[in-house]
Amino acid sequence: SAASDVYKRQIPEGTVVFPREPLVKVVAPIMEAQLVETAILTIINHQSLIATKASRVVCAAKGDGIMEFGLRRAQGPDAGVYGARAAMIGGCIGTSNVLAGQLFDVPVKGTHAHSWIMSFPDEYTAFKTYANMYPDACCLLVDTYDTLKSGVPNAIRVFEEMRNAGIPLKNYGIRLDSGDLAYICLLYTSPSPRD
């Protein structure tokens, strides 16, 4: 048989699907079908997982923009690139993945890395320097050392200093990469922590 004996049909990309609903149908002689089965399943399973999760997070955010930052936790470079693409299909407004941004013409956005914080003598100095560089878009990564004891308090200190200096706080916030996110978010939902 030849490759021309293989027939494939799939639903349009971005279509909402439900459990047990076929996404792709491949009709081919058994050997040809088995040759492509693993590749097709790997691509579809990973990307539909990411797009679905992104869609749920975007829906839960109720209009607040959600960004994709998954490259460092992806199962390899290709999964990072195509995971970013899937997150965009799921409704994310941007990615930190520069290659994905270039390949798929999607907005590249980001904050700073843990290495930025670690390159300064202390966390507060790193935050203050970043805030001075980006006063109109200041999002501080607060879990490099200790989220509750230093990260969030140092971020609040920097934001209060900005406000006291007359710098309008338009696009500012904190970013968490680790820990019990639900618990931390309950403690800190505004520029001043709750008691």
Predicted feature residues:
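Conserved small/polar residues in nucleotide/adenosyl-binding loops
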Residues: 2-10, 188-195
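Buried, small/hydrophobic-residue-enriched core segments of structured protein domains
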Residues: 14-190
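Non-catalytic terminal segments and appended small domains
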Residues: 1-4, 100-102
